[in-house]
């Protein structure tokens, strides 16, 4: 078949438009009026094929389309020539609607069957993702085929968001696109502007495809609501002491009943390290690919529902919170038993073999990691002797000698994948979007760090500067990314990670999106985030600092140099002991020179050791500059230095100089630098899948972050208690941007009711200023107050209002949990927090609360969300 291509594109002098299809490069020829044409004389590919247009200058690609086209040959026999009229696909201003959250979820068409086999001689093809499932794109026009404007002809949406209509005509005709009711074909909205005209008709043996049309409809601003809750926090009558993947089905039912469209969860990867409750932290996965065994529904994985099972399930489900150790211990024991019974039969199944083949690259190393972890009693692979460094041949031999254990872990992951895939399909069938969470870090004792240590800075820790959550900053302990090494293979690890996530989710939250601009990196010898610095960064050279009056030679300004006043403030009556045992000539002895050494020296919880430990930690924080560990002689100003003794000891002129260099460093020096850093990474990662991308952009935000998120159309996160406008105490939801996610709190914050009791003075200001209510402030956050706050958020312009389940329940005096303090999921200021919150009533009971559910449905509908 011969292909004749034409496309309109206004190039600049010296630019060349080319078509890339398969391995071919077709240089198009410039005609008149900005039109480029080209031909493929013999096209023999019968399957659908993707292609793109690119702009070249001097033989190099300088611009490419946002997404590919699909070439499909006409079904009609005898076609020898296909004429294609194309259009350049620029990134639209509403790319969110092109995500799978909309095309497969909210506006998804479900199982529409195979595309209609049309045998006409012309085809209209349009991409339009913003139509609801009860709507159809249609055409009306002149001529017999279109009923002389008296008929509404629906287009085929079996490849939604692509629409097609094939006609057979021998005459020119006029037409228009319109949106119609799917069932009745009653017109809802006609496109704007003059009628369209089909001019040149195809000749004998020809077929014409017009893919250049763009319907002229006003931009639609759909808004929806959703619920945020960790999977482990769900409760049903069928689970085993912890929320499970299958529990999401009941939550999906409830979301559909109340008019919600999104369910947002926390990370679901396996965090098993020690087998203790410390593994409950969902952001410390042992694999960024493997799913956590705690989420499995045991009977569906072959576990027999005998008396032992029923007794354990009853005991564990009766607990108000998760007993992490008992739940996971019993689950793994029962799964071992099921594997012994069903493992061989399962391994023979075709879908099991397909799962192994598709996931072998991470699954087998993960299974080996788990087996070695259990065998050695530690996830710290640096203590595994001959296995400390991953070697494929050595590990393959180990897997052969431990084949039963390897097969067991594969068996569990297969069932987890099967169950979650079933839930994912169930959500899409109900028009509900599952939104996942992409942690910014990986564990230093994980499969990923074991396999790919070159992709990470194992000598550093990721964290966050001081904020409302923690005065000394946060230290997450994760190694930071070696972006330079990752770039060498086009970020293959990230692309694989994203692709795996997209198997289950149609939207995701980038945890700490700032990490793609710059990460807060802390040396491994430090404990507090205060001793961190940004990476990448442009630290000051020693010469620059010297020119500003700060000579760092001899450790001045970079190591603590306390005077008597400082020691007295930090240690009180212990100052003499510190001076005598921990210091020499005004400096700390080497044994106390780092925070890790101090923590090891004073591990006790008694008052004496605690005071010494905390005082020495604070003393080590008391510096003005931190030397860059990879660039000796270059220095970062310490974050939040104004409360340090070192800052207070500066004279007035030097203090003013420091303030200027500090402000320049943190608020001006890096803006373009960090933006360029993010734009090298984020587009590659976002293009790896079709998921809707949302960013957690809270905290210390440089100007380049919202600019970049806007450019890449990543939804921002808006929280009333964490305003982004300087000087505001509370943000106004009425002023949130459309492309954003609006919520009352995150899992790191108190839900509404507990927050209400947190700071009475702040609550009073919120009551009077944000809610605009006079008089005495209620002591408790009464249901009517909660409802009013939720109404504010639902009526915001934000595309998505996703609220914690606790806050939805807070609007009902009978359904809300008696103790608001028990509803908190995490306290970031506590490094090893026990994550064990579970909703207090089963979802089956919540589904039966018809009056409550109808009230939520009405509240959501009245806000215009659907």
Located regions from the model:
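Aromatic-rich carbohydrate-binding modules that target alpha-glucans
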Residues: 2-48, 56-76, 123-172, 180-203, ...
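A short, polar/charged loop/turn motif at coil->beta-strand junctions and beta-hairpin connectors
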Residues: 13, 118, 133, 149, ...
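Tryptophan-centered motif/residue detector
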Residues: 36, 58-64, 76, 84-89, ...
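Low-complexity, Pro/Ser/Thr- and charge-rich linker/hinge segments at domain boundaries
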Residues: 72-89, 198-219
């Amino acid at each position: 078949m011969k292909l004749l291509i034409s496309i309109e594109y206004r190039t600049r002098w010296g630019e060349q438009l080319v078509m890339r299809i398969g391995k071919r490069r077709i240089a198009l020829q410039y005609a008149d009026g900005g039109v480029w044409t080209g031909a493929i004389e013999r096209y023999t590919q019968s399957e659908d094929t993707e292609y793109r247009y690119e702009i070249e200058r001097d033989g190099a690609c300088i611009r490419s389309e946002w997404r590919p086209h699909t070439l499909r040959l006409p079904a009609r026999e005898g076609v020898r020539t296909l004429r294609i009229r194309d259009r350049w696909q620029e990134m639209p201003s509403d790319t969110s609607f092109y995500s799978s959250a909309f095309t497969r979820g909210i506006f998804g068409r479900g199982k529409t069957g195979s595309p209609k086999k049309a045998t006409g001689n012309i085809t209209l093809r349009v991409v339009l993702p913003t139509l609801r499932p009860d709507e159809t794109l249609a055409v009306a026009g002149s001529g017999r085929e279109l009923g002389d404007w008296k008929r509404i002809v629906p287009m085929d949406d079996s490849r939604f968001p692509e629409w097609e209509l094939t006609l057979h005509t021998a005459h020119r005709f006029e037409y228009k696109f319109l949106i119609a009711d799917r069932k009745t074909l009653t017109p809802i909205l006609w496109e704007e502007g003059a009628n369209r005209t089909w001019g040149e008709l195809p000749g004998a043996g020809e077929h014409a495809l017009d893919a250049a049309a763009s319907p002229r409809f006003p931009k639609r601003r759909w808004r929806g609501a959703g619920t945020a809750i960790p999977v482990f926090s769900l409760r049903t009558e069928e689970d085993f002491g912890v929320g499970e993947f299958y529990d999401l089905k009941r939550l999906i039912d409830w979301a559909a009943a109340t008019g919600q469209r999104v369910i947002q969860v926390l990370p679901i990867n396996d965090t098993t390290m020690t087998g203790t409750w410390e593994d409950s932290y969902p952001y410390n996965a042992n694999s960024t690919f493997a799913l956590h065994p705690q989420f499995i529904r045991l009977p569906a994985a072959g576990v027999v529902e005998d008396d032992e099972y029923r007794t354990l399930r009853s005991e564990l489900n009766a607990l108000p919170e998760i007993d992490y150790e008992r739940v996971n211990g019993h689950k793994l024991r029962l799964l071992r038993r099921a594997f012994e019974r069903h493992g061989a039969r399962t391994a023979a199944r075709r879908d099991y073999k397909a799962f192994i083949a598709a996931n072998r690259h991470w699954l087998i190393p993960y299974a080996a990691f788990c087996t070695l972890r259990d065998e050695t009693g530690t996830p710290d692979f640096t203590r595994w002797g001959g296995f400390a460094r991953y070697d494929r041949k050595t590990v393959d031999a180990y897997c052969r000698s431990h084949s039963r254990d390897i097969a067991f872990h594969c068996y569990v992951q297969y069932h987890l994948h099967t169950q979650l895939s079933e839930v994912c399909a169930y959500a899409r069938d109900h028009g509900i979007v599952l939104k996942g969470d992409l942690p910014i870090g990986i564990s230093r004792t994980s499969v990923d760090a074991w396999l790919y240590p070159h992709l990470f800075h194992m000598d550093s820790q990721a964290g966050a500067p001081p904020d409302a959550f923690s005065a000394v900053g946060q230290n997450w302990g994760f190694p930071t990314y070696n972006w330079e090494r990752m770039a060498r293979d086009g970020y293959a690890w990230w692309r694989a990670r994203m692709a795996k996530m997209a198997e289950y989710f149609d939207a995701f939250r980038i945890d700490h999106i700032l990490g793609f601009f710059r990460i807060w990196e802390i040396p491994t010898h430090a404990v507090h985030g205060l001793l961190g610095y940004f990476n990448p960064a442009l630290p000051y050279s020693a010469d620059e600092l010297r020119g500003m009056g700060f000579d760092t030679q001899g450790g001045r300004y970079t190591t603590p140099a306390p005077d008597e006043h400082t020691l007295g403030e930090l240690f009180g009556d212990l100052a003499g002991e510190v001076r005598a045992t921990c210091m020499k000539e005004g400096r700390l002895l080497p044994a106390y020179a780092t925070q890790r050494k101090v923590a090891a020296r004073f591990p006790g919880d008694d008052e004496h050791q605690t005071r010494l430990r905390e005082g020495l930690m604070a003393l080590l924080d008391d510096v003005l500059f931190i030397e860059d560990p990879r660039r000796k002689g270059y220095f970062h100003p310490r974050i939040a230095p104004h409360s340090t003794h070192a800052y207070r000891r500066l004279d007035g002129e030097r203090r003013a100089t420091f303030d200027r260099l500090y402000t320049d460093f943190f608020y001006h020096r890096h803006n373009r630098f960090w933006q360029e850093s993010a734009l090298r990474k984020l587009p590659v990662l976002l293009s790896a899948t079709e998921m809707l991308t949302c960013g957690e952009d809270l905290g210390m935000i440089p100007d380049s972050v919202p600019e970049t998120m806007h450019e890449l159309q990543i939804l921002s996160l808006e929280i009333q208690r964490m305003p982004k406008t300087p000087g505001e105490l509370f943000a106004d939801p009425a002023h949130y941007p459309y492309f954003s996610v609006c919520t009352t709190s995150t899992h790191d914050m108190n839900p509404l009711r507990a927050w209400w009791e947190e700071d009475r003075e702040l609550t009073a200001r919120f009551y009077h200023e944000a809610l605009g209510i006079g008089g005495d402030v209620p002591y408790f956050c009464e249901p009517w107050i909660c409802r009013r706050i939720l109404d504010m958020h639902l009526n915001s312009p934000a595309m998505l209002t996703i609220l914690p389940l606790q806050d939805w329940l807070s609007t009902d005096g009978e359904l809300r949990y008696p103790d608001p303090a028990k509803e908190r999921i995490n306290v970031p200021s506590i490094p090893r927090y026990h994550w064990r919150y579970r909703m207090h009533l089963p979802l089956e009971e919540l589904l039966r609360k018809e009056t409550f559910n109808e009230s939520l449905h009405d509240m959501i509908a009245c806000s215009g969300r659907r």
